């Protein structure tokens, strides 16, 4: 039993080994899309996502930080304006798609800012990692080992779903490639046939021309 617990703990530690992304967000005096700082991630359809951003500073410090989440299909998952401290946005994805978590930092002009930047710590939890397992354990009255097994089961299921998605995408790309090759083949054959027909027509035309001139 002890070895099983150690194995489960090691697996969960490996699965949750991703650390928070930390960066400094410099403030600007104008609003331009190219001054956004965006972090992109991929998520499968109907997957729970929890985005947690922790910023230093405070409201009214002369900077205004906005956060915006959207995916490549144009779905809007959340907006938060003038954030400071911890900000959390929870959503469920609508498509198999990449989503962007974007930040903007603008100077408000209300006061002088000596060091116009905010430090951001960003956590993005997806799928099983986004669930509150302590609450699940309490609600369903699970033992710690049962909770770990449940979490591992969901993590493995996510890996299987990801592999199925990649396999389906590979098959789609293969079908597209084969379709393109067939089109190129038929286009090449049609081009060759047209060139042969044009060559034959030119010979017949020249023969008729020379006969009309009594050259042959």
Swiss-Prot record:
Residues 36-126 form the GOLD domain. One of its GO terms (cellular component) is endoplasmic reticulum membrane. One of its GO terms (biological process) is intracellular protein transport. Residues 207-216 are cytoplasmic. Residues 21-185 are lumenal. Its main location: endoplasmic reticulum. SMART domains: EMP24_GP25L. It is found in: Endoplasmic reticulum membrane; Golgi apparatus membrane. It is a single-pass type I membrane protein. The chain crosses the membrane at residues 186-206. Keywords: Endoplasmic reticulum, ER-Golgi transport, Golgi apparatus, Membrane, Protein transport, Signal, Transmembrane, Transmembrane helix, Transport. Residues 1-20 form the signal peptide. Belongs to the EMP24/GP25L family. Constituent of COPII-coated endoplasmic reticulum-derived transport vesicles. Required for efficient transport of a subset of secretory proteins to the Golgi. Facilitates retrograde transport from the Golgi to the endoplasmic reticulum. This is Endoplasmic reticulum vesicle protein 25.
